[in-house]
């Protein structure tokens, strides 16, 4: 018999129905379940696929650089970053005739183009790129790295170059190399780039391959480093009148601790960032020499964990057994990595707008909104994935004997307490927050807005004041002008911080009130409920009182047949599936809040947010409805404008989103009947019946249909909001 897809599963390859195709796609990356898989081959396959992933990333970033260099307006933008709109790439074939051509010919281009809302122009400008030639050079270099990655992936699948399992499980060596090499050396290299290329470029000096060996980044060269006079590198920083990209008002410092923002670019001082990366580099270079490898010095992680037994005995055997549990479970390691990456990605969303690192990006409002929203959604998907792989760990890799009475086993032992506490917190937050919102709605409906319940977030305001925000009048810590910390801050550390935190032109520590208090608790409800579903899914993955043998059914099962009632919807996969809806819901509230607060801030009418955000109708009417007006006017009987593409994306997003419900609400029988009717008609229709199939068409399984429904729901949801966000922001601010 000829080899049929999927080759990795003979059982599936012999399936006579279309299930073969869908199950084949679904399990293609579940290497553990493939025929003839060994632990060694599993690790080697994953390792090789990392090279493929890197190749794709390098190719993609190379494409960004290449298209901007070829079709963009980078060199024009550099001359006037605040007034020229950055072009992402050309539009080859604008449909809908001459009005479309005119609507999309922008940014000084000769033909229709797309505007870039990704912030790459600001990023490239900040790190010292100035010409299209620079961009082409970068694109070629990344293309080379991409090819190198592909060769590396191929090489590591050859017998001679395949790493052994022992190499993959050498945790100390991997940690040392990742800490020192990945974080330490790359941070040091980045400091080098900032000091040698980016900072000179910000002062009007062009450093390239032809002159970088004879341009001193600092007038005194390496002298201060070797004589211990490091503070000389911080003397004479750029002045507050410095014009970015020119020598006017520039200084000579390379490593500073100024704090706050460059007055013209509204971004962090480049010299502060170089200093930051140098500090990070030193920390990680030291951290990467802490663990015991071939040399017999340093820490053994296993010894560290075995020693972690709390003296009071309240955590049982502490971390005993954890080293082998984690080191032998790829899912546990992936769960930890995803949890960390998810948190970092959300922090990136937060810090990219509150502490902008790139010159002039803070004044590009649409880009700010797009980047915040993008990173929060990505973070949501990554974090839910962490719990999914945590659950798979419990089902496939967890060994109760190895973990007796340690912290992991104790999590399982008192899971009822954990789950019920999370449930209580979610219920409390939900009912109280909704109660306040609805009460306020009713008061407005009755024409008595003064009877709203408006709660000032005094604790959060106190924390903001402690960091130096004076407008609340708390007079505490850094906002107390007579305190020693305040006076020291003026001269020793971050003198620019206190100015920045009290300026209204940035997004540092925004002024908050009752509307913020309410939406904060709505978001807290979403976070706690998402966490509840995910934690319950992982802790109940091995079994529950209702279904003690759950782990024998695997990660995703629909039910245990008709004879065992109540076993539907309780697989670990179902928990993940439900949690994603809550995650999307929560990030919806987060991005609505961020966007509305910033729109009113940028337009100078913060009172609109403050007054309308305290009741639900305010959100629906003054945020969603009011800001969709430009969007739904992307085209009308008189033609179209440059927002039309977002109007269509908005409609298309709704369509995809609604299609999701078709898969989520109906089950297999309906589709099976429909499929058989369609197949009957197909076989009896002339011409059509020339096309035959070998596999008998069958409906998707319950779990697959849910996945397809969830995918459409998620993609449609995000498409719809992305179009709304970009159109409403760019429509207002150009």
From Swiss-Prot:
Entry binding sites for chlorophyll a B1: 654
Top-level taxonomic group: Eukaryota
Membrane topology designation: Multi-pass membrane protein
Single GO molecular function: magnesium ion binding
InterPro entries: PSI_PsaA/B (IPR001280), PSI_PsaA/B_CS (IPR020586), PSI_PsaA/B_sf (IPR036408), PSI_PsaB (IPR006244)
Catalyzed reactions: reduced [plastocyanin] + hnu + oxidized [2Fe-2S]-[ferredoxin] = oxidized [plastocyanin] + reduced [2Fe-2S]-[ferredoxin]
Pfam family, one: PsaA_PsaB
Ligand binding (chlorophyll a B3): 662, 670
Disulfide linkage: none
UniProt-annotated location(s): Plastid, Chloroplast thylakoid membrane
Residues reported in the UniProt entry to bind phylloquinone: 671
Binding site for [4Fe-4S] cluster: 559, 568
Major site of localization recorded for this protein: plastid
Oligomer and partners: The PsaA/B heterodimer binds the P700 chlorophyll special pair and subsequent electron acceptors. PSI consists of a core antenna complex that captures photons, and an electron transfer chain that converts photonic excitation into a charge separation. The eukaryotic PSI reaction center is composed of at least 11 subunits.
Name the UniProt record assigns to this protein: Photosystem I P700 chlorophyll a apoprotein A2
């Amino acid at each position: 018999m000829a080899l049929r897809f999927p080759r990795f599963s003979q059982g599936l390859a012999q399936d006579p129905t279309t299930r073969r195709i869908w199950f084949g796609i679904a399990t293609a990356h579940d290497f553990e379940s493939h025929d003839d898989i060994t632990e060694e081959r599993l690790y080697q396959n994953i390792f090789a696929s990392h090279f493929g992933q890197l190749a794709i990333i390098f190719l993609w970033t190379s494409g960004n650089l290449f298209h901007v260099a070829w079709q963009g307006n980078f060199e024009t933008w550099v001359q006037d970053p605040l007034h020229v709109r950055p072009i992402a790439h050309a539009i080859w074939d604008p449909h809908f005739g001459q009005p479309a051509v005119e609507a999309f010919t922008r940014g000084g281009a000769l033909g229709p183009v797309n505007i870039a809302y990704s912030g790459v122009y600001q990023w490239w400008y900040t790190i010292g790129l100035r010409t299209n030639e620079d961009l082409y050079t970068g694109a070629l270099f990344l293309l080379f790295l991409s090819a190198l990655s592909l060769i590396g992936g191929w090489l590591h699948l050859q017998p001679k170059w395949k790493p052994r399992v022992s190499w993959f499980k050498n945790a100390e060596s991997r940690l040392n190399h990742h800490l020192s090499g990945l974080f330490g050396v790359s941070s040091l290299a980045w400091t080098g780039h900032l000091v040698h290329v980016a900072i000179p470029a910000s002062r009007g000096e062009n450093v390239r391959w032809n002159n970088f060996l004879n341009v001193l980044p600092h007038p005194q060269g390496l002298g201060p480093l070797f004589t211990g006079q490091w503070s000389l590198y911080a003397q004479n920083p750029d002045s507050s009148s410095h014009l970015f990209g020119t020598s006017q008002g520039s200084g000579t410092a390379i490593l500073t601790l100024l704090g706050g923002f460059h007055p013209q670019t509204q971004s962090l001082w480049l010299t502060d960032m170089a200093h930051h990366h140098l500090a990070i580099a030193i920390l990680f270079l030291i951290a990467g020499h802490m663990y015991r490898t071939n040399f017999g010095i340093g820490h053994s992680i296993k010894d560290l964990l075995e020693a972690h037994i709390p003296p009071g005995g309240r955590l049982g055997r502490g971390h005993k057994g954890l080293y082998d549990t984690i080191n032998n479970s790829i899912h546990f390691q992936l769960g930890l990595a995803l949890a960390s990456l998810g948190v970092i990605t959300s922090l990136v969303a937060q810090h990219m707008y509150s502490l902008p690192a790139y010159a002039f990006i803070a004044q590009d409002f649409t880009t700010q909104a797009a980047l915040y929203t993008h990173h929060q959604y990505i973070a949501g998907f990554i974090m839910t994935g962490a719990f999914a792989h945590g659950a798979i760990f419990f089902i496939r890799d967890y060994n109760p004997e190895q973990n007796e009475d340690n912290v992991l086993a104790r999590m399982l032992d008192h899971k009822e307490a954990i789950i019920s506490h999370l449930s209580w917190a979610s219920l409390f937050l939900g009912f109280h927050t909704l109660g306040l919102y609805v009460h306020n709605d009713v008061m407005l409906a009755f024409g008595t807005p003064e009877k709203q319940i408006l709660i000032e977030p005094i604790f959060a305001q106190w924390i903001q004041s402690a960091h130096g925000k004076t407008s609340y009048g708390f007079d505490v810590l850094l906002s107390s002008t007579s305190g020693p910390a305040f006076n020291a801050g003026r001269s020793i550390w971050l003198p620019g911080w206190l100015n920045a935190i009290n300026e209204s032109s940035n997004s540092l520590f925004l002024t908050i009130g009752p509307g913020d208090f309410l939406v904060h608790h709505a978001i807290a409800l979403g976070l706690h409920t998402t966490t509840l579903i995910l934690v319950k899914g992982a802790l109940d993955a091995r079994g529950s009182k209702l279904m003690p043998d759950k782990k024998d059914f695997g990660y995703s099962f629909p039910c245990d047949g008709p004879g065992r009632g109540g076993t539907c919807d309780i697989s670990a996969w179902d928990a993940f599936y439900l949690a994603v809806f809550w995650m999307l819901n929560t990030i919806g509230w987060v991005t609505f809040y961020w966007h509305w607060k910033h729109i009113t801030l940028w337009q100078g009418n913060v009172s609109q947010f403050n007054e309308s955000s305290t009741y639900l109708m305010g959100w629906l009417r003054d945020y969603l409805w009011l800001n969709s007006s430009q969007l739904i006017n992307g085209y009308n009987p008189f033609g179209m404008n440059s927002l039309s593409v977002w109007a269509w994306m908005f409609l298309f997003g709704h369509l995809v989103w609604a299609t999701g419900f078709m898969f989520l609400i109906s089950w297999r029988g309906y589709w099976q009947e429909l499929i058989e009717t369609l197949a009957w008609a197909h076989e009896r229709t002339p011409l059509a019946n020339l096309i035959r199939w070998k596999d008998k068409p069958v409906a998707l399984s319950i779990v697959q249909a849910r996945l397809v429904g969830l995918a459409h729901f998620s993609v449609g949801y995000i498409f719809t909001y992305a179009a709304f966000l970009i159109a409403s922001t760019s429509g207002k601010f150009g």
